[in-house]
Structures are given as structure tokens and as C-alpha cells.
């Protein structure tokens, strides 16, 4: 198991949930956290603990984002008009690495970030190598020609464990995706319950 995969599954164990819906997740076999004290029975969480856990789960889902980066995304969501929790989800789903993952160009969100960073993707015909790049509705994301036959890409397309959401249009023959619109929470196919309103409460304390 690679260091990246080990880190990913550590997040699953820490949360006690299979947050990406992966068949190989260790929480499918056990229901306790990582480390030597992982099997201890957990007590009831305080309100702060519940909010913190919701933040860690959402932050972890999008590739274990750094706290400074995640907080900056939240701050922008809070500045925008409308519901902050919905704005937060919209900003996270507009990230280029998130769209590459949703389009099933790669098997995991961790792989999506690396895939983008290595220059395998273009946006509207221009190569972009920043995973946090924010896409707009109508943007066309394409896997570069020389990258279309990479093993990780071919394996991802064949994965049956998740579907492409309806706010992204994909042609897997051409390896092209169009970001149709910024989604709301109810649009996003999270395998587990995400509670961005608790993230808002956490940062509003």
C-alpha cells in the first residue's frame, strides 16, 4: 500500500466511516480508529466535538486539505451572498481536482490532485497544474492526449463503485468533461452524510 493510500485509509479509520465508499476501506472490516488506542469505546461528543468532526470529515474528503487552505475557502463562502454551507460545498466542488475526480478520470481525489499537478489536464484548451484552480460553469476539462492511456485513467473509467453526477457532462471516449453548473449539497453524491452547517457553526464559535 502506498503512503498516499495509507494516509487516505487513516482518514477513514479516524472518522470511523468509509467516506469515499471504497470497497477496500478498512472500516468495512472494523469499526475503530487507527493506532494502539483505536479500539477504546468512544464517549458522547460535545457540541464542539461534533462540529470539529464534521469539519475534519469534509476537509478529509477533498484530499485532507490543509487547515489554512480550508479556512480560506470557508472565509470566501461566508463572504458570498446566500447560505454559507451551500457556498462552501459549491466552492469545494468547483476545484479542478474535485471535478477530475467526479468525472472518473482518476480513481481517488488524492490521485486527482497529483494528476492535475503533473500537468495531465487542460481547462478550455490551456494546461492547468493547480488542483485548487476554480472552474466556472461551462468550463471544459480534458485529459491531455498523451495521458489518456495511463493505467490509472483506464482503471478509473471502469470503476463501477461511483457514478458521474449530473452537473458534470463526460465523454469518456474523448476524456472530456464539461462543468455544467455549481452544485448544491443535495446534488453531490457523497457516500456518507456531510454536514457543512456544522462546519459553519465550528468557525462561527
Swiss-Prot record:
GO process annotations (BP): ribosomal small subunit biogenesis; translation
Is the Ribonucleoprotein keyword given for this protein? yes
Q: Which residues form the S4 RNA-binding domain?
A: 94-157
Q: Which GO terms describe its cellular component?
A: small ribosomal subunit
Name the PROSITE patterns for this protein. Answer: RIBOSOMAL_S4, S4
Q: Which UniProt keywords apply?
A: Ribonucleoprotein, Ribosomal protein, RNA-binding, rRNA-binding
What positions belong to coiled-coil segments? none
Q: Which Gene3D superfamilies match?
A: Ribosomal Protein S4 Delta 41, Chain A, domain 1 (1.10.1050.10), RNA-binding S4 domain (3.10.290.10)
- Give the matching InterPro entries: Ribosomal_uS4, Ribosomal_uS4_bac-type, Ribosomal_uS4_CS, Ribosomal_uS4_N, S4_RNA-bd, S4_RNA-bd_sf
Gene Ontology molecular function terms on file:
rRNA binding; structural constituent of ribosome
Q: Cite the residue spans of the region called Disordered.
A: 1-46
From what superkingdom does this record's organism come? Bacteria
Question: Which Pfam families does this one have?
Answer: Ribosomal_S4 (PF00163), S4 (PF01479)
Q: Where is the composition biased (Basic and acidic residues)?
A: 1-16
Q: What does the function comment of this entry state?
A: One of the primary rRNA binding proteins, it binds directly to 16S rRNA where it nucleates assembly of the body of the 30S subunit.
Oligomeric state and partners? Answer: Part of the 30S ribosomal subunit. Contacts protein S5. The interaction surface between S4 and S5 is involved in control of translational fidelity.
**Family the UniProt entry places it in:** Belongs to the universal ribosomal protein uS4 family.
Question: What protein name applies here?
Answer: Small ribosomal subunit protein uS4
Amino acid at each position: 500500500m502506498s503512503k498516499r493510500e495509507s494516509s487516505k485509509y487513516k482518514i477513514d479509520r479516524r472518522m470511523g466511516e468509509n467516506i469515499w465508499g471504497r470497497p477496500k476501506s478498512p472500516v468495512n472490516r472494523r469499526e475503530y480508529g487507527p493506532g494502539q488506542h483505536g479500539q477504546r469505546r468512544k464517549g458522547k461528543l460535545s457540541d464542539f466535538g461534533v462540529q470539529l468532526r464534521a469539519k475534519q470529515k469534509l476537509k478529509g474528503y477533498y484530499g485532507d486539505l490543509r487547515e489554512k487552505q480550508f479556512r480560506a475557502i470557508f472565509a470566501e463562502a461566508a463572504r458570498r451572498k446566500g447560505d454559507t454551507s451551500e457556498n462552501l460545498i459549491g466552492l469545494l466542488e468547483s476545484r479542478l481536482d474535485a471535478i477530475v475526480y467526479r468525472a472518473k478520470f482518476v480513481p481517488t481525489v488524492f490521485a486527482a490532485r497529483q494528476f492535475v499537478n503533473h500537468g495531465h489536464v487542460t481547462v478550455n484548451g490551456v494546461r492547468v497544474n493547480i488542483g485548487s484552480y476554480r472552474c466556472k460553469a461551462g468550463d471544459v476539462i480534458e485529459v491531455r492526449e498523451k495521458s489518456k492511456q495511463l493505467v490509472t485513467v483506464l482503471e478509473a473509467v471502469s470503476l463501477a463503485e461511483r457514478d458521474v453526477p449530473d452537473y458534470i457532462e463526460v465523454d469518456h471516449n474523448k476524456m472530456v468533461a464539461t462543468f455544467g453548473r455549481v452544485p448544491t449539497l443535495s446534488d453531490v453524491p457523497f457516500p456518507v452524510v456531510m454536514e457543512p452547517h456544522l462546519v459553519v457553526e465550528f468557525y462561527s464559535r
